[in-house]
Amino acid sequence: MQFPMGPACIFLRKGIAEKQRERPLGQDELDELREAFLEFDKDQDGFISYKDLGNLMRTMGYMPTEMELTELGQQIRMNLGGRVDFEDFVELMTPKLLAETAGMIGVQEMRDAFKEFDANGDGEITLAELQQAMQRLLGEKLTPREIAEVVQEADINGDGTVDFEEFVKMMSR
């Protein structure tokens, strides 16, 4: 099916989720969507910015192209005021969630992987934690320089650690 504005528009057509569904989302799927949404709703106001949408979609296992994100961003700014609430997010994600259920990495799996690296559970992976995890999980002893390079590449905000959002971005590359 072709849409005049490109493939990402499947998310934005009015009522498309209803037409595309072969089945309704199960409670587990809705719970996973809500959990992922809340993870990115940093100020807990019930909205995420269109800028966070790409990261959130990656958390859900869908790897949008830059073109899709650009199209979604343009549409969200025009149609949804630049912010997405949970209901809009469910409508955006339902077709993809149903189409790509097989083989997806869900938020729980991503969080479990993060916890393997975040030894002290403070929500941040430090250089020392990464070095220990690499040795424990992969049997690889990386040099301090190699560990620093990995963290530097993933550390978007420059605080010297890798938080969950940065971990998701790193894992989706």
Curated annotation (Swiss-Prot):
SMART domains: EFh. Ca(2+) 2 binds at D118, N120, D122, E124, E129. Disruption phenotype: No morphologic changes, but 50% reduction of the sensitivity of retinal ganglion cell light responses. It holds the Pfam family EF-hand_7. Ca(2+) 1 binds at D41, D43, D45, D52. Residues 28-63, 82-99, 105-140, 142-173 form the EF-hand domain. Ca(2+) 3 binds at D155, N157, D159, T161, E166. It is found in: Cytoplasm. Inhibits calcium-dependent inactivation of L-type calcium channel and shifts voltage dependence of activation to more depolarized membrane potentials. Involved in the transmission of light signals. May positively regulate neurotransmitter vesicle endocytosis and exocytosis in a salt-dependent manner. May play a role in the extension and network organization of neurites. This is Calcium-binding protein 5.
